[in-house]
Amino acid sequence: MSVKFADNSDKILKAMEKAKHNALTAIGMTAETNAKRDPDMPVDTGYARNSITYAVAGYEAGTKSYQADRAKGNQPKKRGNYSGTMEGEKDEFVAIGSNVSYFPDIELGGQNRKAHHILKKAATEHTDQYKQLVKDAYENA
């Protein structure tokens, strides 16, 4: 009787890497949605809210471009975009954020402006949801 062993470690490692990327992407997408749906998010035209996106390290942002839901005054709807890739080793982390210049005032507060911590809450108040996304990604690898 003979026994043959097959080394499938490369396949397993690739599946685990893909699962990690899928988990980070799912967390980013969900965190983006959680931030945009936060009832504390102050909305005038929707420009800042619509700018919220996620990016997995080493990859482009989940949102390429965005625009306000409505114009302000006689001006056209504001538009913005993201280009480039998130810094860091591929699949090292996922981040959510905005490139709108006044978003730090929304997040952290500013002169005569209350802090809303939209991004912080999206990242920290849904940990059970994010754990489930990781579990699902690895179980489906």
Regions found by a protein language model. Give the residues of each.
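Short, Lys/Arg-rich flexible segments
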Residues: M1-A141
